A protein has these predicted regions:
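Short glycine-enriched, charge-decorated loop/helix-capping segments at active-site entrances
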Residues: 25, 99-103, 258-263, 321-322
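N-terminal Rossmann-like dinucleotide/flavin-binding domain of flavoprotein oxidoreductases
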Residues: 254-301
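Short hydrophobic/charged patches on amphipathic alpha-helices used for structural packing
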Residues: 75, 133-137, 274, 293-297, ...
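N-terminal Rossmann-like NAD(P) cofactor-binding module of classical short-chain dehydrogenase/reductase
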Residues: 305
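A short helix-to-beta-strand connector/capping loop
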Residues: 144, 277-285, 324-331, 374
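Rossmann-like dinucleotide/flavin-binding elements
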Residues: 212-243, 285-300, 308-317, 334-377
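Flavin-dependent oxidoreductase catalytic cores
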Residues: 1-221, 225, 229, 233-236, ...
Length: 377
């Protein structure tokens, strides 16, 4: 029974949305009345031996909304018929806590499950950016929760549990909590879910990996995440595959952007792909190598994949396109500047940096540059 996340029961529980003046509004007991009636009726219908799970937003993380203490108080009115509390958080107005943003720590909600468990002695489930098996094990071992819930992690890798039980953790294709293909598609624009790290999600017939029955050579130019995924897929279906990357390291922009403090989680994706590639004997990787026509021809390719990466979006400022990232210039893209700072970490001290754009990327730049002594505006 979903009693959180701004769904109907949650709207009755929350003082932000429940403005009623009858027996269903006002006090905590009144606001919990609908939840109590629904749960009692479900119990009557299913009998005493059928487990009832109730999901709650233990903290709404909105000014004037229910806090964890409020939640612990209103649960008394309907906890008796509940077998397991599924302890979540957030409302539609605090979506970053409802559908965990990637900057929130792994397993960050577990303290709320612990509080509910300690107050009522009921088994509790926790979830929220639990991507690493050890995090899940630690939560269970400490007794903070009794069950681990996972949604996006199983979209990214439906075999997560099997890989933990039988395989290597490095084989897990971990969710990076970007919320683009899953929540962004389904909730944001009402499209079928996809997944940034798993192209087979809703890929249908186009992504069935069928072994080839004749020799085939594939050349992939670019060793970022797209190039690595293409190269691994080609090798896994039986192609002799060559991947050419001009830089010394694989991973592309994902590996680079993971240098930003709140984007460290992004490194999991290229790391997974590099591990996957390392196990394929018919995949040959050339790093620190320029892809020339002569080299490509020598590989006798049947298929060539151009995965040389994307370019940053630039605002329509006169002269910007012609002058950005020029040698000795003062206008730089985020990727070029991060590369520069990683190579020369002291170079920003005392310098004035103007960031154009206050969206997620602009804020990432501020977070990356300010601690390095730059005067950022």
């Amino acid at each position: 029974i979903h009693a959180g996340h701004s769904y109907l029961i949650s709207q009755f529980l929350s003082p932000l949305t429940n403005k009623r003046t009858d027996e269903f509004g006002g006090s905590l007991e009144n606001r919990a009345r609908l939840a109590k009636l629904v749960i009692e009726e479900v119990r009557r219908q299913v009998g005493p031996f059928f487990p009832i799970f109730v999901r709650i937003s233990a903290d709404e993380f909105m000014e004037g909304g229910n806090t964890l203490d409020d939640c612990l108080d209103y649960l008394q009115y309907f906890q008796e018929e509940v077998d397991v509390f599924d302890v979540s958080a957030g409302l539609n107005g605090s979506i970053q806590y409802q559908i965990d943003a990637n900057y929130l720590p792994d397993g960050w909600r577990s303290y709320m499950a612990k509080a509910v468990k300690e107050r009522y002695g009921k088994p509790c489930m926790t979830m929220g950016n639990i991507r690493n098996p050890q995090v899940a094990e630690d939560i269970l071992a400490k007794g903070d929760a009794d069950l681990i819930g996972m949604g996006r992690g199983l979209i990214a890798d439906p075999e997560w549990v099997n890989k933990v039980e039988f395989g290597d953790e490095c084989d897990i294709r971990k969710c990076i909590s970007c919320n683009i293909g899953c929540a962004g598609n389904r909730i944001g624009i009402n499209r079928p879910i996809r997944c940034t790290v798993n192209p087979s999600v809703n890929g249908g017939e186009d992504y069935k990996k069928q072994k080839i029955n004749k020799p085939c050579n594939v050349v992939v130019i670019g060793g970022g995440t797209a190039g690595l995924e293409a190269a691994c897929t080609a090798a896994e279906v039986g192609c002799t595959t060559f991947l050419i990357e001009k830089k010394p390291e694989l991973g592309g922009l994902a590996a680079l952007i993971s240098k930003i403090p709140d984007k460290k989680r992004l490194a999991d994706f290229p790391n997974y792909l590099i591990h996957r590639a390392s196990k394929l004997k018919n995949l040959f990787i050339f790093k620190n190598t320029e892809a020339t026509i002569e080299m490509i021809r020598s590989m006798n390719p049947n298929i060539i994949v151009n995965a040389t990466g994307s370019n940053p979006l630039l605002p329509p400022i006169k002269g910007l396109h012609e002058n950005i990232d020029k040698e000795g210039g003062k206008v730089s893209s985020i990727t070029n500047m991060i590369n520069h700072v990683m190579e020369y970490p002291e170079d920003l001290k005392g310098k004035k940096v103007v960031v154009i754009g206050g969206g997620a990327v602009g804020l990432d730049v501020v977070e990356f540059f300010a601690p390095r002594g730059a005067d950022v505006s």
